[in-house]
Amino acid sequence: MFSVAMDEQIHLPAGFVHLQTKEIEFRKSNAPFVGVLAALPGFLFEKPELDSKDADIVSNNFWDFGNRFLFTHNADQLVFSGRMVVAILSVLMAVYVFKWAKELFGEKAGLFALFVFIFIPTVVGHSQLISTDVGLAAFFLISSYYFWKSLKHNRLKYKILAGIFMGMALGAKFSGVLLAPLFLLFTLIAVWFSSDTLRDVRYWSEVRKKLLKFFGLVLPVFAVGFLVLWTIYFFPADLSFYSDGLRSVYAEDINPNYPVYLNGDFQKGGWWYYFLEGFIIKTPIPFLIFLLWALALLKKHRVTFLDKMFLLVSPAVLFLLTSFSAHNLGVRYLIPAYPFLAIYAGSIISHINKKATIVFLVSLSVWYVFSAVNSHPDQLAYFNEFVGGSANGYKYMDDSNIDWGQDLKRLKKFTDANPDAKVVYVWRQGDRALDYYGIGKEKNIIDLKENWWANPRGTYAVSSHFLVRAKIMSQAYNEPSLDWLSLYKPKDRIGQSFFIYEF
């Protein structure tokens, strides 16, 4: 359905390099596991040629290498097989949403939590791409589930499973490290505060018992997690392999002066409330109501304090970490929080016992399905009714919230029907992608020296990302004619990522 999206051209080729070289040196600023998994089908069956001594690999020039590698091979086939891997991870995540909600609140709640989860547009949209955020979300949730089980039953098999998926979460994205402090916190709650005998520690022997129990619960999980992570990194001799990657996260390809866009304004460094607002306007309103409803019933749920902590503290910490450390480039960073919230939202079904509440729930559910389905196939660009729907999304956010350069296939259909149309395409997929999809790089006028934007003539298909960024360029260069969003009304759109203008 979609052409190669922005980050796919680095995640997938990097995965091929890792599988070929059996080491994680190329693009070590990103955890490798999702890229490796996505590349595995192509590596085994397509077998594209790859020279591990390629100059771009040696110099860690992952953007240029990824672009050249994909578009000189069968990019569509390689990306399709990689996307199928991520889709499977998304389905697996949905299974555990149902499983956990069922064990906590009953089978009906499990089914309702599953229903809530599978219609979240941001999750669905990124599950169609090679997304490290979806991979992290799946492993984060499953590891948390098994760690919760291990605290409930203290069985070795649950500790091992929690550790396995913890290692995978760490290997999927560096923000997987959040599992460590969360698991320590939950273990502390389980050991010290879960029974009356743990509230009044009078003797050092009792303290010692609790410490032994504490470490007995967490150390096996952490040990297995490290072994899995070490395996993902192909058993490096230097055990600082992961911390080296963590340190390099902000060292590569990050421009601190890049102006972040929100609500029509630009600001270097972004806003602390970027992700909170993004969550509110890019999540269907019925989902938000389900969640508030569940929170209003917080004291009525027949589950333990520890159960509630797993479902509420985990997404809260993810929100906080994302808000104060992640670049303001997309609500996709919040995807790992959604399954926990869907599970908790599912709990409301166990409190539905009046006709009025049944009618209200059904009405919300119909609205929810309509809102989500109506955005197909552009779930990635979904915005809710608070801002007037997806058509107005560009007024509030850009980048991976709307346009990631993923609509070249639909652009090809448009240019076939309108052969004289000019294209303005700014993503790093660039000329090779335009040629690969049969559009032709010569149609892209972005680099023409003449001021084509000042006196436009004919038909233009313009990337919405460019249109948003042109607003700040028009201010910086005192060039009002660049600001097409203010000057002209588009005749049509291709999804939400290309605006069609006729002059």
Q: What role is predicted for each listed range?
A:
Residues E103, D196-G216, W293-V313, K355-I358:
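Membrane-interface helix-loop-helix junctions at transmembrane boundaries of multi-pass membrane enzymes
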Residues A113-I118, Y145, M166, L170:
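Short helix- or helix-capping micro-motifs
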Residues V387-F503:
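C-terminal luminal/periplasmic domains and tails of membrane-associated envelope-modifying transferases
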